[in-house]
Regions:
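Sec-dependent N-terminal signal peptides
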Residues: 1-8
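Terminal beta-strand-rich extracellular "head" domains
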Residues: 91-125
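C-terminal segment of classical bacterial N-terminal signal peptides
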Residues: 9-19
């Protein structure tokens, strides 16, 4: 009878619910951006007087040009900002007033010429809806005036500022 009881209990244990086994299974993927930001032309500050640095060609400056290549229309916004500070400079004891402008330049598709009129501006940043596939070049003018309106001379040395250009998925 003992053996019968053992078989009965063993049979019952097979019918009892088991603990569920679980595992986390990863799913991975890679997305390549279909919007690429490139520097077409590096900017250079001209120094037309002691208190101004400007990218304007009339003052021996070079306006930087950003090229954005888009292979998927209506998927990205371009956000481009002119500088509002130096990333490196001599020590400055007074304020710097910044002005600038971002504008659509050359385009690979004629309809892209509407980008400028349809863009929005927040401070130094201009946002463009990239509604067409192709290439757009953007110019980014920048002027820095030293002395808080008092026209104080910039100290001698090297100055560097950065244009921020990004593709943002819509």
């Amino acid at each position: 009878m003992t053996i019968g009881l053992i078989f009965a209990l063993a049979g019952c244990s097979l019918l009892m619910p088991k603990e569920a086994a679980a595992d986390n299974i990863d799913i991975t993927g890679t997305v390549q951006s279909r919007c690429i930001v490139n520097t077409d032309t590096a900017g250079v500050y001209g120094n037309p007087n002691a208190y101004t640095l400007t990218t304007l060609p009339a003052s021996n400056g070079q306006v930087p040009i950003v090229r954005i290549d888009v292979s998927l229309a209506n998927a990205y916004n371009a956000e481009i900002s002119y500088p509002t500070s130096f990333s490196s400079s001599p020590s400055l004891s007074d304020t710097v007033a910044w002005t600038g402008a971002v504008a659509t330049g050359q385009t690979s598709v004629s309809g892209m010429s509407a980008y400028q009129a349809a863009s929005t501006t927040t401070g130094a940043k201009r946002t463009y809806a990239l509604t067409l596939a192709g290439t757009t070049w953007f110019t980014v003018a920048s002027t820095a005036t030293y002395g808080g309106g008092g026209n104080k001379a910039f100290p001698g040395g090297s100055y560097k500022a950065v244009v921020l250009a990004e593709c943002i998925a819509q």
